Amino acid sequence: MNPNTPADVYYGQMSQGSSMPVTTVPSHSHYASQQPPPLLQPGSTYAHQYGTPQYGYANALSSPASIPPSLPPSMNSMAGQSVLPLPGSGSMNPAVYASGGFDTTGQVAPPGMKPRVTATLWEDEGSLCFQVEARGICVARREDNAMINGTKLLNVAGMTRGRRDGILKSEKVRHVVKIGPMHLKGVWIPFERALDFANKEKITELLYPLFVHNIGALLYHPTNQSRTSQVMAAAEQRRKDSHGQLRGPPGLPSLQQHHHHHSMLPGPPSLPSHPSMGRPALDRAHTFPTPPTSASSVMGPMGNSDGYQWSQQSMSGTQGNSSLSLDTSLGSNARSMPSTPATTPPGSTIQSMQNYPPVSQSYESSRQMYQGQSAQQAQYQSQQHYSSQPQHQERPVYSQSSYIKNDMGPPSGRPTGQSNDASDSKPPTGMIHQGQGQSDPGTHAGSEEDDDANNEAEYTHDSGGYDANRGSYNYNTQAVNSLPHDHGLAPEIGGSPHQAGSGRATPRTAAAPSSYYSAQGYHTPPRGQPSSSLYNVMSNERTGSNGTQGNEMYAGQADMPSSLPNGYSAQPSVMNGSSGGLKRGRDDDDDGGRPTTSAPNLGPGMDMKRRKTMMDGGSLPSPTYTATIAQAAPSAIAAHRRR
């Protein structure tokens, strides 16, 4: 390529004085339209601006007039120089043909000027930047829209900060960059405005070749083609990889690069298309894990497509379909897969909870009776039930109290002593026949067995069913109410140990049944008593075996000692009742099996244990108390029958 030919063409073009209308839009298409003759148009584009600079700053200060038109002869003198010598440092020094145009346009290199241009890829903006250094300040120019960093440009002019900021703020078209490398920060202004500023401040020659239109050609100087081609290729490769946009330098005469340049003009729309391709993956990554984590245990196997569809429905807000699919999967898999709290519907949970009580019919019926009716209603209902049976007239009243007492917990061994009297021993022994009578049949007399045959079925069923659950509530009332009255030590001293020993015999041996109910109101039972609470714990533990009549051994033990501490707790104090409960547990361990001697006459070993426990002041063990009850049962029953 002959370097002289382009220069001649330039000068002939300028001598004709041809001018082209100025395009004010700072777009790259402005330069693309000038490329078909790539080296002819740039010089004449700004030729008409020489005579009319028309430039003024915001502070009404105007720069001197533009450079006088004596520069073209100087450029003519430069025409003799074909190529500027390349410096030894390897910096790119192009031929004079690359700097055509007047000096005010920045197209022609000053005499002896060595253009220094570097190109870097501005990754944040996705554009290639050409950088020119002047006075130690780097001024950058974008390759895509030719905008120039006006802040750095005015810094080269030595302008104060206030004046510089005022000028840049008055610009209509500007792009503020606050993030990135230091030499790229600032206010970016269009190419024409930057050239005007440079001409007013007389820094156009200092900034050469910043304003050269085909500044990219400076990087492709034939003498330095190998290095510059590598730099540009690397820059464009990075730009293509990161942003999917490939754009050739504007000034390349190569047809291939020119073709790429025009074909990739709609490159900015391709930028959003690239992230949009990756967006569905991001959405799935953010939304898909949510449904499986909450319903993976019951939703069963689910394809990937179904999972993505589920998540997309949730994202779009159509919750109906997703919830339906989840519910159906729950219903189908609930039978075969274990339900977890996170996914089990509340309805199925409630049903499963309600299914347990019917296993024990007595417990279920007692619980319903306890919940549905008050204590007094249940008592009168029990009166009607027992009055219908062939018993004495007073039997319903006492059976009610006995039923209430037995409700509190398994009955004590007191009825074994009363079993001598066939008719009156039934109410207290209703529970005993179920518990102790089973565990220790030898402790009952023949008359007691007859009574069992007559009344155990109907009485034991009721008391067993209600004792299992309701007994503790009613018994708390009885035990607490017996304390404030005169039932403490007097019943035992008066020869009626039944009241003190067992809470179930209190109505018979104490006051009349009417006074028994009126004095000891069942509507407002005070509940703060350690013995009753301890007894509740023990009775609740053992009501299952007693009510269902499962294990005879433990059922009998539960019946005998559980009521004893409460019965004797009424005598000394509340604390004795609780301590009696502790001794009761100890005696249970000692008993193991019940004594097989007859109820009226227990062995001497039992008598010694009775003496020991009575001296301690605590509640009597079940065998000892059984002996005590057996001795005084006839008198107590007779007194109750006289009432």
Curated annotation (Swiss-Prot):
Keyword terms of this UniProt record: Conidiation, DNA-binding, Nucleus, Sporulation, Transcription, Transcription regulation
Effect of inactivating the gene: Destroys the ability to make protoperithecia (female organs), but does not affect male-specific functions.
Record feature DNA-binding region, as residue ranges: 150-171
Biased composition (Polar residues): 13-33, 306-335, 350-367, 471-481, 529-551, 563-577
GO CC aspect terms: nucleus
SUPFAM superfamilies recorded: DNA-binding domain of Mlu1-box binding protein MBP1 (SSF54616)
Low complexity bias: start-end ranges: 336-349, 368-391
Primary role: Transcription factor that regulates asexual reproduction. Binds the StuA-response elements (StRE) with the consensus sequence 5'-(A/T)CGCG(T/A)N(A/C)-3' at the promoters of target genes. Required for rapid conidial germination, normal vegetative morphology, and protoperithecium formation.
Family the entry assigns: Belongs to the EFG1/PHD1/stuA family.
Protein name, as recorded: Cell pattern formation-associated protein asm-1
